């Protein structure tokens, strides 16, 4: 089993558990150049809030979009947008990635700005 297949199988297990519980989830996806975050409804049918390093306002704030600092900026933005929509608590879906580096920076920044996990 290669790395990608192992990550995808880990993410499937997490998503099945979260869907059974019906929690709104913060889903993180990363590429070498960008970080994406989405808040998805409990039944998995709609994206409620989204933010990424592809957006112009995020690109203006950071020098390079594929590092820890830019992931922290995305975390701040996603937390602020959740507050505007009235979402205060989410379950964290790390999509099979390790809780380290950019994923960790995004979540910690979201926590600091008032999003509860």
Swiss-Prot record:
GO MF assignments: 5S rRNA binding; structural constituent of ribosome
UniProt key word RNA-binding: yes
UniProt entry keywords in alphabetical sequence: Ribonucleoprotein, Ribosomal protein, RNA-binding, rRNA-binding
GO cellular component: cytosolic large ribosomal subunit
InterPro entries: Ribosomal_uL18_bac-type, Ribosomal_uL18_bac/euk
Record's subunit section: Part of the 50S ribosomal subunit; part of the 5S rRNA/L5/L18/L25 subcomplex. Contacts the 5S and 23S rRNAs.
Function: This is one of the proteins that bind and probably mediate the attachment of the 5S RNA into the large ribosomal subunit, where it forms part of the central protuberance.
Family from the record: Belongs to the universal ribosomal protein uL18 family.
NCBIfam families: L18_bact (TIGR00060)
UniProt name for this protein: Large ribosomal subunit protein uL18
Organism (species): Francisella tularensis subsp. holarctica (strain LVS)
Gene name of this polypeptide: rplR
């Amino acid at each position: 089993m290669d790395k990608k297949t192992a990550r995808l199988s880990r993410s499937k297990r997490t998503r099945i558990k979260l869907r059974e519980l019906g929690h709104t989830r913060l889903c993180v996806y990363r590429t070498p150049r960008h970080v994406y975050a989405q808040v998805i409804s409990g039944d998995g049918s709609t994206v409620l809030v989204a933010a990424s390093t592809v957006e112009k306002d995020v690109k203006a704030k950071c020098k390079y979009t594929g590092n820890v600092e830019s992931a922290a900026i995305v975390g701040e933005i996603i937390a602020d947008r959740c507050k505007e929509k009235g979402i205060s608590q989410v379950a964290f879906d790390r999509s099979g990635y390790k809780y380290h580096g950019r994923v960790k920076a995004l979540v910690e920044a979201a926590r600091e700005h008032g999003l509860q996990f």
